[in-house]
Amino acid sequence: MDNLNELVKECGVELYDTEIANENGRAIYRIYITKNGGVSLDDCEKVSRLLSPIFDVEPPISGDYNLEVSSPGLERKLSEARHFKASLGELVKAQTAEAKFAGRLVKADDESIALENDEGVFEIKIGDIKKAKTYLEW
């Protein structure tokens, strides 16, 4: 669905990411949304009520599925430059083909990020990152 961003914006939130998962043999189409000040249950409900009838006519995936709408959570996947920019100052784990890094995200632009930990500051090109997510230290 090409206009998913625009549809979600009608509800006063931003599209963060989508995901297709399989849990207990059931397909789940997840839509993650964000907004300044945090996402409420009402926000999720608005998006779900807007998209459900549209997806009944133009399904986002083939076959039977459940639609879930939620915030990306405190420990969330980072895959786009905008995700990293919005996570400045947070703890991030990133994996490239060569190494794994963990530290505080101290820089993020369209091309690269920088993670700082006790060993120093590590600059990583976003295109080299295979997997990244925020994490909490308890």
Swiss-Prot record:
Name the gene that codes for it.
Answer: rimP
Q: Which GO terms describe its biological process?
A: ribosomal small subunit assembly; translation
Keywords from the named record: Cytoplasm, Ribosome biogenesis
Is the keyword Transmembrane helix assigned to this protein? Answer: no
Top-level taxonomy:
Bacteria, Pseudomonadati, Campylobacterota, Epsilonproteobacteria, Campylobacterales
Per the record, its GO cellular-component terms are: cytosol
Q: What function does this protein fulfil? A: Required for maturation of 30S ribosomal subunits.
Q: What is this protein called?
A: Ribosome maturation factor RimP
Where it sits in the cell: the answer is: Cytoplasm
> Which family is this sequence assigned to?
Belongs to the RimP family.
Primary residence: cytoplasm
Which CDD domains does the entry link to?
YlxS_C
